[in-house]
């Protein structure tokens, strides 16, 4: 079905232009009449959802819990719909929740076409900055539409239709975003897998998703080396069961062409040259937009399924309400498209809201140096940056005084957001000092697709919250701290972080082909709640402190000690640049904490001296109950591509147990180095 844009303009929110809606406002979560709302760059959207005081945050959070249908129905008016929804919230079959039932939309239209129809086609949609290829490009909304609509035509020509899956195996290039949007345009379900991901893991995901087409690129570029994607893909297809009908290959410019397999492979440029543009295909609100596989799973792959309608509503709302951005401002999420941050806040979120998104093919250090982030912020006039604490630590480790950043003027830079792992106070304070903007930690998960807790600065939350917190509950997320018996804990008591159902729009609707695991993993331990599997506590003001995964709570002689709390204490000692704490088995206490530390470059003291000081420091800040006495010093910690430390793997290594190095680890050789250090320490 080809959409009528006149119809799309007239059918928005949950009703036709000026027409009364069937059903009561309380059921529909809306006023009795509505007018078309096609949000443009100049529009303010829902006034009450964009600016305000701390009191406004409280009002919004209370409303989202008391009457979620009305609250999110109002937010959904900012998205264009082909067909009105008949019910805002359907939760008859818990734990599953459906939002905007029977409503029809297209997220690609909302992210691209509607801005052009609003006269904003020449505005910049994507800034591509690739220090690894020495390339910079600005791409307008019109140019994105031209590429995306043609690519949609290419996919349709190859037999891809609504509901089919497409695997995307590409580096951080604009063509990856075009492919995501092209799939969304025709109702195909994309599954984006890291470019350069190991063949075995790639094969598992291809077999599970069963894509009609795989879209890939010839090469990825890492600092100092090229990654050949085609041999990795060929090996994945050789060892796997599923065979895609076609493999579409984008050959990167100024690099050698890769040979095509006759009858299967297609050349991107050749297909695009003869492609016909394709219109958007309306899909139901609950239609899966994408499958995103999470790492470290056993058995069936854990493919998070994202419903289209709720995701579009939530992401658009967060850009103003959480991140405080106005349409047209430049936003940079320094992540990878393969992570949920890349899906939500490199691709869909900023484009839905009419922002310019920075696509950065580089690293915080080494491309070429620790001044890279400062350069990108200054050159492109970035208003807000979202990165992981590990990126900040890497910059600090190489350039403790941020001397390389001082040459850049960050006149438009307003806010730095961090997430992906717990941000220690030392890193937070250093970031504030060198970037000279508020630095706000927030917390969310692949499953939720957007923040669970944050400082919602668009709703008037403080830009100077207490150190160590990860924000307050985002409207829609009714977070509680429970013990293992489902009893609510008092302020500052460490417990299980859970979310009272229903989950708000945008949260996952299931696991691909594995709904039993969806129910068992997330909803059985605490009936009526979503189990985040994280541990933490809330203070008296409602700020959440996420300490560690539940598995990372160390039981020391019956005392539950958060590994994250010890890490923060160690990092606050001036000699340590990075740290991971794991529980080491102990015949007397059950477990004792062991710290793996990376020292700062300018430390002159001996390791024995440093250890003595750190032990004393931890005893002063946490107390003798932590039983902290041991640390080893390593040159580097293993990290995933999203900057997370694989603590369960390190725990197995430290305790002499078999361990598996997941393919998301950037440098697996570090485990061998740590093993050697541990042997010498015994």
UniProtKB/Swiss-Prot annotation:
* Catalysis: reaction(s): acetate + ATP + CoA = acetyl-CoA + AMP + diphosphate; propanoate + ATP + CoA = propanoyl-CoA + AMP + diphosphate; butanoate + ATP + CoA = butanoyl-CoA + AMP + diphosphate
List positions binding ATP: 420-422, 441-446, 534, 549, 560
Enzyme Commission designation: 6.2.1.1, 6.2.1.17
Query: In its keyword annotation, does this UniProt entry include Glycoprotein?
Result: no
**Transit peptide stretch:** 1-29
Q: Which InterPro entries match?
A: ACAS_N, AMP-bd_C, AMP-bd_C_sf, AMP-binding_CS, AMP-dep_synth/lig_dom, ANL_N_sf
- Residues modified as N6-acetyllysine: 519
Function of this protein? Answer: Catalyzes the synthesis of acetyl-CoA from short-chain fatty acids. Propionate is the preferred substrate but can also utilize acetate and butyrate with a much lower affinity.
Q: Which PANTHER family does this chain map to?
A: ACYL-COA SYNTHETASE (PTHR43347), ACYL-COA SYNTHETASE SHORT-CHAIN FAMILY MEMBER 3, MITOCHONDRIAL (PTHR43347:SF3)
Which family is this sequence assigned to?
Belongs to the ATP-dependent AMP-binding enzyme family.
The name this protein carries in UniProt is Acyl-CoA synthetase short-chain family member 3, mitochondrial
